[in-house]
């Protein structure tokens, strides 16, 4: 009996392995029947995608434990992804695995119309007037942090420090001084967000609720963050101070089209998601920016000249929005860092209706994906793609969907301007106050869906003499 079953299983696997697929679907990368290339994907997803591109070209499909993930790479192919309609491509269906972090009824776990209304509320809280006010807040918190935590000299893990500093400054901008009263500069929020980040990895995309240690830590961290944010919301409701105007205020006073207001749990989820999306991008990009600048003194000197001319000479030491916008070299450096090291290695949508690309049909049910990390390092898109050359951005690249670090189309990142502003402000304060010594640019850790430098990223610092 057992022998008969074994023969049947082997026969099914053989049929699976040699079964021909329709000729008009994208070429398939498949190694083991049913399992496919899941092991390679879990171990090093970027290497698998890049190798598949080199072998199969701009469109191909990975078989992953019953999931089919079709990648489109290069500006022309990526246009299919970014220009797809909601009827064709659903971000909501692709990103349900983030529900343990964002929460129920928030963004990707809500109906499509509700999701777009929630995203509109967030954008309303990040308008120009808020960005201008944010500069002073970021400067104040950054200076206070260095004075209380760094002192005159020492050695630190830069990524760890920038994680704490970016979430400290972002949370103050988004939620006001209440967050300081709750946490001060303890770094607790950064540590909790690190646990959330560790709970989003390639395995979580397929099985987000497995009883894994990293997922248990993620869920515990989420509960603690939610409790902190709930207490801040309750304090805000009790307050009689009507001068507060931040993103939290915007969310608490927003209404859906039917006239209903956001529930506190939805506000908490949106704040968690907004901070999560911005914090890891900013801290990773800021860390890499500092390493690249100090390993490329030509660009370091140019950015310092801008800071000296704009901040010190013209504005008598004041950092403001208009001055930061004029720091063009620093902006090109940040964009080049994002091209080389985009924190989000994959962007995904679920295919709802079959889609065509150059004679190939992508069936409904597939996950359609682009990889900023692979797509922005193609030699057909950027000359010397693995080299750090910020001057390539001195002239605007008008090729649609060649630079996709912030996504593209109607699903572009709403916090792009805030993130760049935050990085510029922190670097301006840091480079004005301290001399830094760094080693080579660290490699990237691709074991998480949020890819940052492999730590520790040790940096020596000493306060500049006035």
UniProtKB/Swiss-Prot annotation:
Keyword entries, A-Z:
Heme, Iron, Lipid biosynthesis, Lipid metabolism, Membrane, Metal-binding, Monooxygenase, Oxidoreductase, Steroid biosynthesis, Steroid metabolism, Sterol biosynthesis, Sterol metabolism
Gene name for this UniProt entry = cyp51
UniProt-annotated location(s) = Membrane
For this protein, the record's PROSITE patterns field holds: CYTOCHROME_P450
* Molecular function terms, GO-annotated: heme binding; iron ion binding; oxidoreductase activity; sterol 14-demethylase activity
Listed under GO biological process in this entry are:
response to imidacloprid; sterol biosynthetic process
According to UniProt, this protein's pathway is:
Steroid biosynthesis; zymosterol biosynthesis; zymosterol from lanosterol: step 1/6
- What is the protein named? Probable lanosterol 14-alpha demethylase
Q: Where does heme bind?
A: 413
Q: Which family does it belong to?
A: Belongs to the cytochrome P450 family.
Which SUPFAM superfamilies does its entry note? Cytochrome P450 (SSF48264)
* One cellular component term from this protein's GO annotations in UniProt: membrane
Q: Manganese among the record's keywords? A: no
Reaction equations catalysed: a 14alpha-methyl steroid + 3 reduced [NADPH--hemoprotein reductase] + 3 O2 = a Delta(14) steroid + formate + 3 oxidized [NADPH--hemoprotein reductase] + 4 H2O + 4 H(+); a 14alpha-methyl steroid + reduced [NADPH--hemoprotein reductase] + O2 = a 14alpha-hydroxymethyl steroid + oxidized [NADPH--hemoprotein reductase] + H2O + H(+); a 14alpha-hydroxymethyl steroid + reduced [NADPH--hemoprotein reductase] + O2 = a 14alpha-formyl steroid + oxidized [NADPH--hemoprotein reductase] + 2 H2O + H(+); a 14alpha-formyl steroid + reduced [NADPH--hemoprotein reductase] + O2 = a Delta(14) steroid + formate + oxidized [NADPH--hemoprotein reductase] + H2O + 2 H(+)
Q: Known InterPro entries for this protein?
A: CYP450_sterol_14alpha_dmase (IPR050529), Cyt_P450 (IPR001128), Cyt_P450_CS (IPR017972), Cyt_P450_E_grp-IV (IPR002403), Cyt_P450_sf (IPR036396)
**EC number(s) recorded for this UniProt protein:** 1.14.14.154
Q: Name what cofactor the protein needs.
A: heme
Function according to Swiss-Prot or TrEMBL = Sterol 14alpha-demethylase that plays a critical role in the third module of ergosterol biosynthesis pathway, being ergosterol the major sterol component in cell membranes that participates in a variety of functions.
């Amino acid at each position: 009996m057992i022998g008969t079953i074994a023969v049947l299983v082997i026969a099914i696997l053989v049929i699976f392995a040699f079964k021909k697929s329709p000729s008009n679907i994208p070429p398939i990368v498949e190694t083991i029947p049913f399992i496919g290339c899941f092991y390679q994907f879990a171990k090093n997803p970027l290497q698998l995608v890049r190798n598949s591109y080199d072998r199969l070209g701009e469109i191909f499909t990975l078989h992953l434990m019953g999931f089919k993930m079709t990648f489109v790479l290069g500006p022309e192919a990526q246009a299919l992804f970014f220009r797809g309609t909601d009827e064709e491509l659903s971000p909501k269906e692709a990103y349900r695995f983030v529900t343990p972090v964002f929460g129920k009824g928030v963004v990707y776990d809500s109906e499509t119309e509700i999701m777009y209304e929630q995203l509109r509320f967030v954008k309303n809280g990040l308008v120009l007037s808020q960005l201008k006010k944010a500069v002073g807040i970021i400067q104040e918190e950054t200076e206070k942090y260095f004075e209380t935590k760094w002192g005159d000299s020492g050695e630190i893990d830069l990524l760890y420090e920038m994680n704490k500093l970016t979430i400290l400054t972002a949370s103050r901008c988004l939620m006001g001084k209440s967050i300081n009263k709750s946490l001060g500069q303890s770094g607790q929020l950064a540590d909790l967000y690190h646990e959330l980040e560790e709970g989003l990895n390639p395995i979580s995309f397929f099985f987000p609720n497995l009883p894994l240690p990293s997922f248990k830590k993620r869920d515990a961290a989420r509960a603690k963050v939610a409790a902190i944010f709930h207490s801040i919301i309750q304090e805000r409701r009790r307050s009689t101070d009507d001068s507060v105007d931040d993103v939290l205020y915007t969310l608490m006073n927003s209404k859906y089209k039917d006239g209903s207001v956001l529930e506190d749990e939805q506000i908490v989820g949106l704040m968690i998601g907004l901070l999560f999306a911005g914090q890891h991008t900013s801290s990773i990009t800021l860390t890499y920016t500092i390493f690249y600048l100090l390993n490329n003194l030509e660009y370091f000197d140019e950015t310092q000249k801008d800071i000296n001319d704009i901040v010190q000479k013209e504005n008598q030491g004041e950092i403001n929005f208009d001055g930061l916008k004029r720091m063009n070299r620093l902006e090109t450096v940040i964009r080049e860092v994002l091209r080389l090291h985009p924190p989000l290695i994959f962007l995904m949508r679920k295919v709802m209706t079959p889609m065509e690309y150059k004679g190939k049909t992508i069936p409904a049910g597939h996950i359609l994906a682009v990889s900023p990390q692979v797509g922005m390092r193609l030699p057909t898109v950027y000359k010397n793609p693995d080299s750090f050359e910020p001057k390539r951005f001195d002239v605007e690249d008008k090729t649609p969907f060649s630079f996709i670090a912030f996504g593209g189309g109607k699903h572009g990142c709403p916090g792009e301007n805030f993130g760049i502003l935050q990085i510029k402000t922190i670097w301006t304060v840091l480079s004005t106050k301290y001399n830094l010594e760094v080693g080579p640019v660290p490699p990237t850790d691709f074991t998480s869906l949020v890819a940052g430098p492999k730590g520790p990223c040790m940096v020596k610092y000493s306060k500049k003499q006035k």
